[in-house]
């Protein structure tokens, strides 16, 4: 009897093991397909994760700005951070809301804050993975040299839907990074 029960439950356990990651993939694809498209300015670096490969550790200048928490919220509450494209074409945090809106991602207020306090918002994207070959080329071309600033402006294309934000694409100098690599490599080298 015990063995029969195990044999009956085993397929259910296997199905659940596949269902959870599959649901996450489907949700992410839905956000990429139907979400609000915006671009955020980046402060990139290109570290290496031995187990996962090359990625950009994402840091956003927008995270350094302070915002006032709306009335009626306290630590532990979920608010919605509204991103809108500015005149520069980049996404900026325009307001914090207690209700979900288009172009807003969910953010949980740390416990030590209450309504009226000023807070900095951490955008919940920390890494953008790249194919190894592309990452090495970008690292060589984009790196700081002799205390110079980077040679390109980097932005991250994101999609937002139902309070979730996902990374979609990396842009360098206003173009998708693969186009930028192709164009940058086709330019003749300048002599010193």
Give the ranges of each region predicted by the language model.
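Hydrophobic membrane-insertion alpha-helices, especially the h-region
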Residues: 5-24
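Cell-surface/extracellular proteins and modules involved
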Residues: 6, 55, 59, 64, ...
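Aromatic-capped interface at the extracytoplasmic side
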Residues: 18-40
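Extracytoplasmic
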Residues: 35-37, 55-57, 76-78, 88, ...
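Short extracytoplasmic
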Residues: 39-71
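A mature extracytoplasmic/lumenal domain signature
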Residues: 44, 54, 62, 85-87, ...
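Short, Lys/Arg- and Gly-enriched loop/turn segments at beta-strand edges
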Residues: 50-51, 64-75, 89-94, 165-167
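Extracytoplasmic/periplasmic terminal helices and flexible tails
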Residues: 82, 91-96, 107-192
């Amino acid at each position: 009897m015990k063995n029969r029960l195990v044999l009956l439950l085993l397929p259910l356990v296997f199905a659940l093991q596949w269902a959870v990651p599959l649901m996450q993939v489907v949700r992410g694809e839905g956000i990429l397909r139907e979400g609000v498209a915006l671009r955020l300015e980046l402060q990139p670096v290109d570290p290496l994760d031995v187990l996962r490969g090359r990625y950009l550790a994402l840091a956003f200048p927008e995270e350094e700005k302070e915002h006032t928490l709306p009335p009626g919220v306290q630590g532990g509450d979920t608010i919605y951070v509204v991103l809108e494209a500015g005149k520069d074409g980049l996404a900026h945090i325009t307001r914090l809301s207690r209700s979900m809106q288009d172009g807003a991602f969910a953010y949980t207020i740390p416990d030590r804050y209450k309504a009226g306090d000023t807070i900095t918002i951490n955008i919940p994207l920390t890494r953008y993975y790249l194919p190894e070959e592309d990452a090495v080329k970008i690292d060589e071309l984009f790196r700081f040299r002799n205390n110079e600033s980077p040679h390109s402006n980097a932005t991250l294309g994101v999609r937002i839907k139902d309070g979730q934000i996902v990374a979609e694409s990396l842009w360098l100098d206003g173009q998708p990074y693969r186009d930028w690599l192709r164009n940058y490599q086709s330019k003749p080298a300048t002599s010193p």
